[in-house]
Amino acid sequence: MVAEVCSMPTASTVKKPFDLRSKMGKWCHHRFPCCRGSGKSNMGTSGDHDDSFMKMLRSKMGKCCRHCFPCCRGSGTSNVGTSGDHENSFMKMLRSKMGKWCCHCFPCCRGSGKSNVGAWGDYDHSAFMEPRYHIRREDLDKLHRAAWWGKVPRKDLIVMLRDTDMNKRDKEKRTALHLASANGNSEVVQLLLDRRCQLNVLDNKKRTALIKAIQCQEDECVLMLLEHGADRNIPDEYGNTALHYAIYNEDKLMAKALLLYGADIESKNKCGLTPLLLGVHEQKQQVVKFLIKKKANLNVLDRYGRTALILAVCCGSASIVNLLLEQNVDVSSQDLSGQTAREYAVSSHHHVICELLSDYKEKQMLKISSENSNPEQDLKLTSEEESQRLKVSENSQPEKMSQEPEINKDCDREVEEEIKKHGSNPVGLPENLTNGASAGNGDDGLIPQRRSRKPENQQFPDTENEEYHSDEQNDTRKQLSEEQNTGISQDEILTNKQKQIEVAEQKMNSELSLSHKKEEDLLRENSVLQEEIAMLRLELDETKHQNQLRENKILEEIESVKEKTDKLLRAMQLNEEALTKTNI
């Protein structure tokens, strides 16, 4: 048996996974979810552990790679790289077959010791499979049958609702509202809602009637349930809300209606996916655009720590990557395994996405460099420096003005003292000369001398007065020039302040205009939504009318066929009677 496994595979065995799926799938598809299409553990369900092939595989792989086979040795610790058994012929064969076939279970076979579990096809899609109920007639009572098929007259339905409990559940915990909503019987739904049935009852998968209506894309029933107050945010057993199913179905209209009625745009399912992350993972570009417009969080993380950008890269959707990069998302964020979006793009050989990411990084670097060398900031700094200088000059000018009057006062005192000295004895002549002249010659002889001496005696005080007046004029000129300078500086300060006020007013006006625009946009969106809902109702009414006309035509044809058959039967009977009479 060992020799068979270690030998090189033939052409027929290459097409299949060399009987490992048939053996390992039963034995342990806890580690081989792709072998049987299920990630559930099947340990202990059969006696295949004693198979000779599995004993050999356990003996080889258990030592060689416990990272991939933790159940073989009872340990989940990685043993990759501890021995050289990877170059064994058995491992070469296993790498050649399983490396490409199942890197979910064999991440180390691709030359990496890191776990790749949860990187690609890790999400459970069973929630979105089989949206409609599988109904067996014998499992339903009269009310549930009428709710599912909807071919019962209104009077009979009213009688049924009087006689039985309208919130009664079947074996699968479904109410009449569940069945009517899932099959699109809007008349039955309306009748149940008018009778005030319970809206948020959960079936065996914890789904409400609203979730079933959205899952089965029954728009009219969805609108009826929302108008009557059905809860939009109740999750099912997978954690999905009604909005998750609307996004999965790419039903933008129902997603709009749910958000209009207050659905949570950031609700996560058990995989950690918000509606946006689900749309990215399923590569629903139009719905992703819609959620971005509705301001969904672009940096939210799933259970593996991955952003919307990393998911888009992993799925290989270049268009969604471009969409997200236009919104300036974080490119450098890492998931729980420490990998960025660029590393995933490089490892999966998505060259277009690599180019998009590199171009985005270059643009961001250019933006940062332009912001660092911004001329507006330099202008702001120079204006601030000028204002500080003007303030300093204003503070220094009053000090100068206060010092100048003190100097002028000192000068005035000195001049007054000198005038007093010269006024008491103007020339300093001896008293005897003046007296003698007055005795001999009288007053006439002395008067000419005094007249001639007065200009000489008073020459000094006149020159001093002139100097004083010139100093005063210079001081006044200085004061005037300084006052003019201060006036100019004050004017400049006022103009700067006015400019600042104008800029602030412009900012306020722009912010107000933006808020008004946002309000107008919201009002327009609401009006558009209401118009779309009205159009939907009109379309549904038209389709109903057309269906009724078709049904009437079919009924008329059936009646005509019945009449013809009745006539034929009567003719047959008459012929038989005639034959019997002739025979008699």
From Swiss-Prot:
Biased composition (Basic and acidic residues): 377-392, 401-412, 466-481
GO CC terms, sorted: plasma membrane
ANK repeats: 172-201, 205-234, 238-267, 271-300, 304-333, 337-366
Biased composition (Polar residues): 482-498
Record localization: Cell membrane
Membrane topology note: Peripheral membrane protein
Chief subcellular location: membrane
Keyword list, A-Z: ANK repeat, Cell membrane, Coiled coil, Membrane, Repeat
Chain coiled-coil ranges: 494-583
Domain of life the protein comes from: Eukaryota
Tissue: Expressed in prostate, ovary, testis, placenta and prostate cancer cell lines. Localizes to basal and terminal prostate epithelial cells.
Region entry Disordered, spans: 369-502
UniProt record similarity statement: Belongs to the POTE family.
Protein name: POTE ankyrin domain family member D
Organism: Homo sapiens
